């Protein structure tokens, strides 16, 4: 599953891009619900990774 590291700047770019709404705002960083995230199966790229300016969304 994907997860967001502490380098998250809380910019909010990723949340609206998630096709399965697995991303939500945490206390200090955005978080990905591992049970919901399907890593954008069937799409050309992982939507959140593609838009993250901090490059902090990584494979878990």
Curated annotation (Swiss-Prot):
Coiled coil: none
GO molecular function: 4 iron, 4 sulfur cluster binding; metal ion binding
UniProt keyword 4Fe-4S present: yes
Residues bound to [4Fe-4S] cluster 1: 8, 11, 14, 52
Source domain of life: Bacteria
PROSITE patterns: 4FE4S_FER_1 (PS00198), 4FE4S_FER_2 (PS51379)
SUPFAM superfamilies registered for this protein in UniProt: 4Fe-4S ferredoxins
Co-factor(s): [4Fe-4S] cluster
Pfam families (UniProt xref): Fer4
Protein residues bound to [4Fe-4S] cluster 2: 18, 37, 40, 48
Boundaries of every 4Fe-4S ferredoxin-type domain copy: 2-27, 28-60
Entry's cofactor comment: Binds 2 [4Fe-4S] clusters.
Keyword Nucleotide-binding: no
Keywords per UniProt: 4Fe-4S, Electron transport, Iron, Iron-sulfur, Metal-binding, Repeat, Transport
Function, in words: Ferredoxins are iron-sulfur proteins that transfer electrons in a wide variety of metabolic reactions.
The name this protein goes by in its record: Ferredoxin-1
Source organism (scientific name): Chlorobium limicola
